[in-house]
C-alpha cells in the first residue's frame, strides 16, 4: 500500500476510536453511580473557587512581607551615646534569624507548631478541628483556640487581623499557602519571633527576654527558652508572679515535647524541669529612663515633626525605630534634679505634712492602681505606697512590686499642714503616701506644694544639657521650664543695661538712685517706682546699680535710652515681645525659664544668638541621618588633606544680636553680682561666674540665672497659682543656693576658665564706687577693694583720673548723697509702684 493510500485509512481509524469513546461515555453517564461520582469530585473544585471568590480575591499580597518593617521603638541616647529613654507602644528589638539560639527555635516549634519545617502552611486536621470547634461554640461567648500553624499566626498578626470568625480562619489558610510560596521557613520564623506579643508590653523574643529575665535572648538557658515559648497564646495565664504553678506546669510540658521531638535529651529535660522560673519582678527596660521633663519635651518636639505612627511618614515616634542623639548630660541632669528638689524642700519641707489627696480601692487590684496613680515622689530613695490597713500605732503599707511594710505612728508624727494633729491620724486605707526607708520600717515624707524649674545650656552651641520642669513628671507633667509663663523680675535688668551700653552709657556711667515718677494722665496721677528697702543712694555707677539690683536706676536708664530700645533687645534675645511700658524694664512681662537662660547664654556667647536644642541628630531605622541640629557646611573637613594647612573651621552658626563688646561688658558687670552683689552666696565657688538674681512682687517668684563661660543655668521657684512666698523670699536666698548646689556637683571636674574679652575691649582701672579712672593703685583679690578692672569700648573710658591719695574720697563723697536722698515716707504716694529688690510691682 502506498503512503498516499495509508493516510485516509489512519484518519478513518482515529474517527472510529473517537466515536467509540463518545458512545462509551454516553453509556457510562446513563449509569447513576457515575453521575454521582462526577458530582462529588466537582464539589471541592467548585467550593475552592467559591471560597477564592468570597475570601481570597481581596486579600493583601504575601509579597508585602518581603519588605515588612515591624513597629520599632524610638531610642534616645545621651550626649555620650548611652541609651537613656525609649518611646514605644510596642517594646520590640528586631533580630535576624541567625541571632536566634537553636534551642529557642526548638522550644517555640515544639510548643506551637511541631511540623512547621515540613508542612506547606496548614495543619489540615488542626484547621478542620478549629472550624468545627468554632461552629459548635457559636453563641456561647467562648473563644476557642487551636489549629493555627506558625505561618497562619504570621498571616493573622501581620495581614488579616485578630477578628474571631470562620472567615478569618479561611483567610488565614489562603494567606498561609501564599506566604509559604513567597518566604522561606527561616524568614517566616524570623517574622514570627520578632512580632509575637509575649506580655509585659514585650513584642518579640528579645524584648520579652529583657522583660522577664533582664538579659539578652542569647544569654537565656533552656528552661528560660521553654518559658518564653508558652507565652504566645495567653501571657496573662502564665504570669510568673501570680500564676507560678500553672506557668511551671506548662513550661515543663514544652520541655517534654522538646524531648519527644528529639531536640533535647532526657537528662537535659530533667535538669531544666528542676529549675525555677527565674524571672525578675515587673517589666524590665534596657534603657535608664533618665530626665523625665527633658525627655517629655523632646517627645513633644518629635511628635510635632514626625507624628505618632505613619500619619506623617515612615518615621513615627512610636513605630519608626528612630535613633536619636540627644544633648542630655546625665550627670548634670541628675545634679539639676537633686538641686531643684532640695531647694523646694528647703522652702516647703518643714511646714507640715501635705496630704496629696489621692486614694485608691485596696479591695481590688491595688498594685495596678498604685502603679497607675499620678503620684511622683521625686527622690530615688522615696517610694510611693498605699495604706492597706491601720491597727493601733502601725499602718500597713503596700508597694507597687507587691511587697508590704509598716509605718509606725512615731514616723508619721509631723502635723498635717493646717492642723496641730499628727499626720498619722489622717491616714486611712487607700491613702497614697510617700515614704522613705527607716531601718526595718518606713518614715512618712511630704511632697512640697511649691514648684520650680531649672534649665542648663551649653554656651558654645545652645544645647540643653539638663532640664527639670517640676518635682516629678509622673505626678505632674506640666513642664515649667518651657510652659510656665512667669515674670522674670530683676533677671530682666541685664537686657535693659545691655541696650544702654549700646546707646552711649558705660559701666562707669553715673545714674541717680533717687525718686522717679511717671505722669500717667489726668485722673491717674503719678506712677512712682521704688526700691525694696533702704534709703536711695543718690548718684552711683551703672555697675553698682546692677550689683545691688536697684530698681530706680533701672527705670531711669530705660527712660533715658527709650523703652523701644529695651523691648527690641528683649525681642532680639528671644525673651519675648513686650509693649514699651517702663514696668517692662523691671521684668513685668511674662517669659519662660528656657528663654531667659538662653538670653544669658547669648550674652556669654559674646552676643551671638543661640537656638536652644535638645536633639543633636536623628537617624532612621536604616541608619540614614534625617535631621541634624548643626547644618553648617565645613569646606575642607577631610582629615587627610589637613597636613600643612590651617585647621578648617565651619562658618558661625547664628547671627550677631548683641555687639560682642557690649555682651562682654554686661557679663563683666554680672560677675560683680556674684562677687559683692545680691548673689554673693556663690562667691565661695571660687571660679569665674556671672549671674543675676530676681524676685517678683509679692514675692511670688524667685530667680537666679548665671554660669561660666561654658555653661549657663537658670532656676526659678514659685507656686503654680501665684501667691506670696513670704517676705524673706528673694532670689539670692532661695534660687541662688539651688544653682550653687548644682554647680558644686556639675562643675567639680571642669577647669576654672575666665571669660574672654573680644577684640577692642580695654580693661581700665577705676574706682568702683565713683567710676573714675585710677592711677597709682591696682586691683586686688579682695572683692570689696576700691579699685577694680572695668571693661570699656574704645574711646569710652573715663577721662578724669585720680591718684592713690584720692582713693578714699569717692566713698566719703557718697555719704552726703545718701543723707540727701528723700526719705521713703516723703515719696509720692499716687498709684505707688512698690518694688521688691530685684522685683516688679
Ranges and model annotations:
Residues 292-316, 454-487, 498-499, 604, ...:
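Active-site beta-strand/loop architecture of penicillin-binding DD-peptidases
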Residues 1-3, 63, 281-287, 320, ...:
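Soluble, non-transmembrane domains of envelope/secretory-pathway proteins that act on or interact
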Residues 48-49, 53, 141-400, 557, ...:
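Non-catalytic, structured segments within soluble enzyme domains
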Residues 1-77, 115:
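N-terminal type II signal-anchor transmembrane helix
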Residues 108, 258, 336, 392, ...:
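Active-site SXXK
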Residues 137-164, 218, 283-290, 460-463, ...:
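Conserved catalytic neighborhood of penicillin-recognizing serine enzymes
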Residues 117-127, 203-206, 265-269, 478, ...:
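Short, well-structured active-site flanking segments
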Residues 73-79, 100, 220, 383-399, ...:
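A short, well-structured edge-of-sheet supersecondary motif
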